[in-house]
Curated annotation (Swiss-Prot):
Glycosylation sites: N83, N169, N186
Extracellular side: 67-223
Keyword Nucleotide-binding found: no
Positions of transmembrane segments: 46-66
Start and end residues of each C-type lectin domain: 101-211
Membrane topology per record: Single-pass type II membrane protein
GO molecular function: carbohydrate binding; identical protein binding; signaling receptor activity
A cellular component term, taken from the record's GO annotations: plasma membrane
Protein name per the record: Killer cell lectin-like receptor subfamily B member 1C
Other observations noted: The anti-NK1.1 monoclonal antibody (PK136), recognizing Klrb1b and Klrb1c genes, is known to identify NK cells from B6 and SLJ mice, but not from BALB/c ones.
Tissue: Expressed in natural killer cells.
Length: 223
């Protein structure tokens, strides 16, 4: 076979472009979504934004409602304390015929009776028999009374079966503050005579001294 026949039998190879043909072009409106789909997407986005705003508004409202009672309680507490402060500055007085000393009011009876009757009389006045706090308080009372020859019942008595002196509020007598001079017997109650505290029969007749804590109410004229 000659050379010319060989060349004629061979087919020419395809060009490179034939293996990489471009894909067929799409119609111009192939990527466009239908108008109804676009509208639905917009409505969904708007609904989502509205939902987020609603949740934020509700959370703010809940927080305000939770904090409101606390603020109201705080205002009430402040107002009550302001009222108390006002009362303290205005009504620091004892009833008529009572003596004021520090935070107590004192009343000296003008009649004599037993220790029990003296305590009952103080109770009717919203008070108790005298509970001596210290020597300074006792000196104030002695200087105010200025009666050296009269005995006055105080809220101290000898109790059984403890066999000990106790104040009527239940506290034990402290001999470092006061000294009791005299013989103590069963059924003894304490009275002050001058600057001395002495034991006496609770059935004896003496005058007495009442005391009550200073309060911030309008003073009464009861004596």
């Amino acid at each position: 076979m000659d050379t010319a026949s060989i060349y004629l039998g061979l087919k020419p190879p395809r060009t490179l472009g034939a293996w990489h043909e471009s894909p067929p072009s799409l119609p111009p409106d192939a990527c466009r979504c239908p108008r109804s789909h676009r509208l639905a997407l917009k409505l969904s986005c708007a609904g989502l934004i509205l939902l987020v705003l609603t949740l934020i508004g509700m959370s703010v409202l809940v927080r305000v409602l939770v904090q409101k009672p606390s603020r109201e309680k705080c205002c009430v507490f402040i107002q009550e304390n302001l009222n108390k402060t006002t009362d303290c500055s205005v009504n620091l007085e004892c009833p008529q015929d009572w003596l004021l000393h520090r935070d107590k009011c004192f009343h000296v009876s003008q009649v004599s009776n037993t220790w029990e009757e003296g305590q009952a009389d103080c109770g009717r006045k919203g008070a108790t028999l005298l509970l001596i706090q210290d020597q300074e308080e006792l000196r104030f009372l002695l200087d105010s009374i200025k009666e050296k020859y009269n005995s006055f019942w105080i809220g101290l008595r000898f109790t059984l079966p403890d066999m000990n002196w106790k104040w009527i509020n239940g506290t034990t007598f402290n001999s470092d503050v006061l000294k009791i001079t005299g013989v103590t017997e069963n059924g003894s109650c304490a009275s002050i005579l001058g600057d001395k505290v002495t034991p006496e029969s609770c059935a004896s007749d003496n005058r007495w001294i009442c005391q009550k804590e200073l309060n911030h109410e309008t003073p009464s004229n009861d004596s």
